Design a protein with these regions (language model features):
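Non-catalytic interaction-recognition regions
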Residues: 1-441
Length: 441
């Protein structure tokens, strides 16, 4: 409950961890606006308000027998009870108020929301939190400044009492909860609670952005310093387990990726300043990591591998980045900018020369459709696939057409415009995934 030395020490440690988390995520180009703390859901009585709603609407009932005796429970999401099980009788709750319980005896599969010792489960607090998210609770957090980014943008954190002047959070139209597939049942319970309370629209607009696990290839595990048994070396992947002490610190992974990328950059661009080479290596490394994590569908287990992620060939971030660098080099050698070419008049009759040219322009123009597909399916893998396929098409175009030595000026302008259109689509497509385009590679 706070107010003692142990609580103060705990707060000091947790705040230090949160700040380090923010710094690590910042390296990946990931930023936050607001950090809600679970403790405030109880301290600010969010749960008390949610509990009253849940009881009044009959979403929760008090169990008087069976393994859940003395608990407040709700029907587990997806559990289709028989007609005999759904018959209800009124049972007294500890507070003297009437509540309903199953007439045919206890539902042993019901989801416990409040334990018999009156402690609230994770799902219970999550229900209250989502009522706040949708502006259905009638109460708000206090807000305090917590962390400032280099551009002066502020991260806020919840508090029991906060600053009077703060941004507005909550009251959303749709909610996306990014949490792994093991939380499917708890998230379904949140949705069923919203529906049971009569908030049908909000239940439909609460999305569990589920994803599978990230593991390591044996080669990657060894590169990170782990000693593997002969048996482990033959396995397709090595699972990460915090409880077993087998894991990867995000900063260590990022550092290792940057170091590997910098070896390539140093060997190719020794004439550049070290700070420039370091920045380019970071862009390649972060791009490689983000692309690798996004190219798999959400239901796929991701077996991370350094060599595969940093490869300049195949479906990787560096492959897509290199296509942009290749296009940029064309304009540098031509003494023109891509923007100048796009501002000029382009004779599109040259599209009739080759089906591949038409397909390349068509693909470059499908960026918006790809974005809509990602949103509709909540599947970012489509963005990664789009970038790879467009880069692949552009590389085929690059090797087939001698752009800079083309003698027909109208056709040369058309070929330059083709490169400019594709370059723009690739830059925007990678930017949607949080990936920068380095000036050289």
């Amino acid at each position: 409950k706070g107010g003692n030395e142990a609580a103060e020490i705990g707060k000091l440690i947790s705040n230090a961890i949160i700040r380090r988390h923010l710094e690590t995520m910042q390296r990946l180009g990931i930023e936050y606006d607001f950090l809600p703390q679970e403790s405030e859901i109880l301290h600010l009585h969010f749960w008390d308000l949610a509990f009253e709603q849940l009881k009044q609407k009959g979403v929760l009932y008090f169990e008087t027998e069976g393994k859940n005796k003395g608990c407040w429970v709700m029907k587990r999401a997806g559990n289709k009870a028989s007609s005999s099980q759904t018959a209800k009788v009124v049972s007294p709750a500890p507070d003297g108020k009437a509540t309903e319980a199953a007439a045919e005896g206890p539902d042993e599969d019901a989801k416990v929301i409040v334990r018999s010792n009156n402690t609230v489960t994770y799902v219970g607090k999550d229900i209250a939190y989502h009522l706040w998210k949708f502006g259905l609770l009638g109460r708000d957090f206090g807000y305090q400044r917590f962390y400032r980014y280099p551009d002066s943008r502020q991260v806020w954190i919840s508090a029991e009492s906060g600053e009077a002047d703060h941004p507005h959070f909550g009251g959303v139209h749709a909610s996306y909860t990014v949490i792994d597939s093991r939380q499917e049942d708890p998230q379904n319970n949140v949705i069923e609670a919203l529906r049971g309370l009569g908030y049908t629209e909000q239940a439909e607009n609460h999305h569990h952005f589920s994803y599978a696990f990230v593991v390591l290839t044996p080669r990657c595990a060894e590169e990170l310093g782990y000693k593997l048994s002969a048996e482990d070396k033959e396995r397709p992947f090595i699972e990460i387990s915090g409880r077993k002490g087998f894991g990867v610190k995000a900063d260590d992974l990022i550092d290792a990726l940057i170091a590997a990328a910098q070896k390539e950059v140093d060997s190719r661009h020794a004439e550049m300043q070290e700070s420039e080479r370091r920045e380019i290596a970071a862009q390649i490394a972060i791009g490689a990591l983000r692309y690798f994590m996004l190219k798999f569908t959400k239901s796929s287990v991701i077996a991370f591998d350094f060599k595969e992620a940093l490869s300049f060939e195949g479906e990787t971030g560096p492959y897509a980045q290199y296509a942009i660098v290749r296009a940029t080099n064309i304009f540098r050698k031509a003494g023109l900018s891509a923007e100048e070419i796009l501002a000029g008049e382009t004779d599109l009759r040259f599209l009739q020369e080759d089906d591949e040219l038409w397909e390349l322009w068509l693909s470059a123009g499908q960026l918006s459709s790809m974005v809509e597909q990602c949103i509709a399916t909540t599947e970012p893998a489509y963005a990664a696939k789009y970038a790879f396929q467009l880069a692949q098409q552009f590389n085929n175009f690059y090797h087939k057409h001698h752009i800079l030595t083309e003698t027909d000026e109208a056709r040369k302008h058309f070929l330059l415009a083709t490169a400019a259109v594709v370059r723009r689509a690739l830059i925007e497509g990678l930017a949607l995934m949080g990936i920068d385009a380095p000036p050289v590679m």
